[in-house]
Amino acid sequence: MITESRQMLDKRNRPLRDLRISVTDRCNFRCTYCMPAELFGPDYPFLKKEELLSFEELERLATLFVTRFGVEKIRLTGGEPLMRKDMPELIKKLARIPGIRDIAMTTNGSLLPVYAKRLKEAGLKRVTISLDSLEDERFKKINGRGVSVSKVLEGIEAAKQAGLGVKINMVVQKGVNEKDILPMARYFKEKGHILRFIEFMDVGNTNQWEKKDVMTKAEIIDLINKHMPVEPIAPNYIGEVASRFRYLDGSGEIGVISSVSDAFCGSCNRARLSARGELFTCLFASSGFDLRAPVRQELSDDELSEMIGTVWKNRIDQYSVDRTLSKASGKKKVEMSYIGG
């Protein structure tokens, strides 16, 4: 049933349309900009199994977001989501929710050779795969676990063969991998996959972010345009975070996610559910709203919906805009590996 709450807007008149679900805070990589190995070591207190929302609890909450609030897309994140056991079973549960249009996953790709076919059969439609360099030694250093580029490329091919839609994300950092922009663009242009460049962001508190390390959207596009001319094109939908550009020779497109240099807070329609069941209304949030406790206290769907609706209606987040206006300095934020990228 379509309810009035489908049109619910936050304090800045932004609707709720996308839900990102972090299914685990664990990862088999230790990327320097997300889970640096020196801080996320063997003794790091990751969540215990009983602290995680169960698949049944995730299904229940996701159903409310879709049927009561009009969410159309769900993206599964982590950590590395494929570190969570039996992920195809969760996807099957989510795929049967009435009204859901799209289920996607963000992954480092290393486990896709094992899981891609089963994920597709379960109902997953798309994957976004993180790859920050094609140069093996540089990539091994970035991922902090010595994983070779070939392992991720195998995952990309497995996803393609399984019939999943594929996009590639590259986080660009000056002094780290800006030399890889053109090789990455050429490689995935030839392969026919959309590559999206992500400006290095100050997510969490552990990645030693400094603005001088950010290569901006303008700089990235200027570099590519000199070698492979591109032109801007319209977004696919309202709230799409990547600015889109197509190659003038007709051989595909790229995107740039520019949270730092060109904030898109004004059209952000995403809510984020952590693995522990906290609802966050911004990637750069300091705290979330606990939904796990009321779910386990067996509150009714109406009561849970009232809580979710109250959180969204009171949402005022615009961190990236505030950063631009120098209003966000010193704010303590939740780590990306916990909230989901």
Curated annotation (Swiss-Prot):
Enzyme class: lyase
Known cofactor(s): [4Fe-4S] cluster
Keyword Coiled coil on entry: no
GO molecular function: 4 iron, 4 sulfur cluster binding; cyclic pyranopterin monophosphate synthase activity; GTP 3',8'-cyclase activity; GTP binding; metal ion binding; S-adenosyl-L-methionine binding
Pathway annotation from the record: Cofactor biosynthesis; molybdopterin biosynthesis
Residues annotated to bind [4Fe-4S] cluster 2: 265, 268, 282
Cofactor notes: Binds 2 [4Fe-4S] clusters. Binds 1 [4Fe-4S] cluster coordinated with 3 cysteines and an exchangeable S-adenosyl-L-methionine and 1 [4Fe-4S] cluster coordinated with 3 cysteines and the GTP-derived substrate.
Keywords: 4Fe-4S, GTP-binding, Iron, Iron-sulfur, Lyase, Metal-binding, Molybdenum cofactor biosynthesis, Nucleotide-binding, S-adenosyl-L-methionine
SUPFAM superfamilies hit by this protein: Radical SAM enzymes
CDD domains xref list: Radical_SAM, Twitch_MoaA
Any single GO BP term: Mo-molybdopterin cofactor biosynthetic process
Residues that bind [4Fe-4S] cluster 1: 27, 31, 34
PANTHER family (alphabetical): MOLYBDENUM COFACTOR BIOSYNTHESIS PROTEIN 1, MOLYBDOPTERIN COFACTOR SYNTHESIS PROTEIN A
Subunit comment: Monomer and homodimer.
Protein name from the UniProt record: GTP 3',8-cyclase
